[in-house]
């Protein structure tokens, strides 16, 4: 029986013919909504957010890279997102609304278009088993999208604390706060480069009075419209901010390849009105764009393992229910 269950967890999924960089694709979760899966520094575990079929809110879970050992590490209260391991694999941090109450905060109103809710998240640090959680930000507006510097000393994250969605850094104890971006618009989803000298992120900055008014109006309601975003890179101190892509549509979830020279990200630029996002790889200077996934379903939130040998991402492929999002892992083939 144990071997049968393990075989189910390790279910192989065929790659599309155009997915030449992906070998030995395995599906790690089955059912519900699963996303934002990130490797531990050792590459042995994955932390991700999961909304089970009978639950109304995302919580943080950890599992081994073969899909075994699945367990919840957040409190089960409120909504959580953006979990990440510290460099010692023994601690984690994530964003949660649990301080505002145990209930799941309501979903946004989509009657005027697709929007993301900017819930009252704060960032918490906990042991890897979920015990000992403590709050390291205390801000009445959105603090989330946190990731860790390679040396383990700095958290980079997105905050609405000054009335705009900007990127900040802080120490792992929540001190030494520094604002890195100041242009009106959504700067978010930051990750450090492997050497810690750069930060890759997604951004959209309104260019017209109408776009600025729409953005400010939504921000006042703790909402943002994520339909136009491009990939950007800046130095870790916030200088030399430069746009990498100019594709149109929504380009998000960027992550550096371990070589520090390339960036993988998700995009729907081929059909900006579609949910058919695919993964793309591009040089950090914006050259040599290459499509990685060719599946007709949603593919996003990619992350390379620390050694660059594996890729983990979230996808609607192979779902038993339309729109179901699961976590997949594949061996990365560098030169097919």
Regions found by a protein language model. Name each.
Residues 1-7:
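Sec-dependent signal peptide recognition
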Residues 13-32:
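A short helix->beta-strand "capping" segment at the edge of beta-propeller domains
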Residues 24-27, 68-71, 120, 131-134, ...:
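Predominantly a core beta-strand signature of beta-propeller blades
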Residues 30-33, 49-60, 75-80, 95-122, ...:
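A flexible loop/linker signature enriched in serine peptidases of the S9 family
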Residues 41-42, 87-88, 150-151, 194-195, ...:
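Residue-level detector of Asp-centered blade-edge/turn motifs that repeat once per structural unit
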Residues 46-47, 92, 155, 199, ...:
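Hydrophobic beta-strand positions that form the internal "hydrophobic ladder"
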Residues 64-68, 127-131, 171-175, 235-239, ...:
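Short loop/turn segments that connect beta-strands within beta-propeller blades
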